[in-house]
Amino acid sequence: MPPKKQQQPAGSSKKADQKKKEKIIEDKTFGLKNKKGAKQQKFFKAVTHLVKFGQQYPRQAAQTESEKKLKKEDKKKELQELNELFKPVVAAQKISKGADPKSVVCAFFKQGQCTKGDKCKFSHDLSLERKCEKRSVYIDARDEDLEKDTMDNWDEKKLEEVVNKKHGEAEKKKPKTQIVCKYFLDAIENNKYGWFWVCPGGGDNCMYRHALPPGFVLKKDKKKEEKQDEISLEDLIEKERAALGPNVTKITLECFIAWKRRKRQEKIDKAEQDMERRKADFKAGKALVISGREVFEFRPELVDADDEEADDTRYTQGTGEDDEVEDPVCVNDVDLSLYVPKAVDETGITVASPERFSTYASIEKDDNKLSEASGGEINSSEQNDLEDRDGDEELENGVMDAVPVDENLFTGEDLDELEEELNTLDLEE
């Protein structure tokens, strides 16, 4: 008889069936999964449904899926109830190497299952977690350990170890420094410093200090202070004005004009000095970079000079007196009388120009003409002014310009004929 086939476990058969179904779906719907057409997507869904659920209707498949979800939720609820009734087994507690076990609260004591009592190496103080202090960046923990590690707690081996470390050759070669470790600073600046941070420069054996000196300010704190210290331009000006004090020279028109003239003269003198210095450097051959204008200013004879390869054109330097201007341009000279400096009143009131009276008089004349044109009455003073003006015009012309009027131009008969013509006239559009 042939040997019997070994029965496979149920879990493995389910996984194999699931893989077979996925393989069939991939073969039958090859290239259709990512198609955008509605027909292709409908066909893809139908094939996957048939392979997974057989000839079941979609409603039945949805019901089975919902039933499975409900079963999973029921199992979770049962586990929670069992955990509440019977406390679960707590995993063995682990701590990092070198850490003090008394600084960690016992996990079994939290669940009320610790039976060791005082012999337990972990702490049974639940408030210990809230008492943990923040690690200070201004204190090196190694210094505190050295202060607490006194000779009263040493034995012979510890004493020999300390002597060898303190007076050994390796310790003598090792330089003593107060420089702060760069890895320590980088960790603080980048917010990476914490309880589990280890110095990449050697850990606890790092020769540099892992503590900030007193008064040290980090870069991120400096930026915050700079932002807070920024003030507006107006506040800065007022602050500087207040710092001057009362014993200062008051700015008036006279002192301002004197200051302006002095500054202008200083500017002119400085320009002349620079020109003389550059001219001397040019003559001495020290000037390496000069402009073409400066060359002709320093040596005017170069204007009439001619090179060997130049053409026969001769350039003349005009004086400006005999030159003829074909297109005359109207030039208005600047009247300096218009720019007379005036002191401003301290109360802030602006000084009006004297021309306002002439403009006001011209406005009054225009108003009088407007009232005459509209048929308004004229005052006696205005009438006298008009008569005087008319008399002046007559005297200037010598002869009074008058237009003769024909009184018999339009008689009654002419007006009657005009009305008849208007009545009998046919108007065309």
UniProtKB/Swiss-Prot annotation:
A zinc finger (C3H1-type) spans 100-127, 175-213. Keywords: Coiled coil, Cytoplasm, Metal-binding, Nucleus, Repeat, Zinc, Zinc-finger. It is found in: Cytoplasm; Nucleus. GO terms for molecular function: zinc ion binding. Residues 1-11 have a biased composition (Polar residues). Residues 237-261 are annotated as: Required for interaction with DRG1. InterPro entries: ZC3H15/TMA46_C, Znf_CCCH, Znf_CCCH_sf. The keyword Coiled coil applies. Residues 1-28, 56-75, 301-327, 362-415 are annotated as: Disordered. Residues 59-87, 219-285 form a coiled coil. Its main location: cytoplasm. It comes from the Eukaryota. Residues 384-396 have a biased composition (Acidic residues). Pfam families: DFRP_C, zf-CCCH. One of its GO terms (cellular component) is nucleus. The keyword Endoplasmic reticulum does not apply. Belongs to the ZC3H15/TMA46 family. Protects DRG1 from proteolytic degradation. Interacts with DRG1. This is Zinc finger CCCH domain-containing protein 15. It comes from Gallus gallus. The gene is ZC3H15.
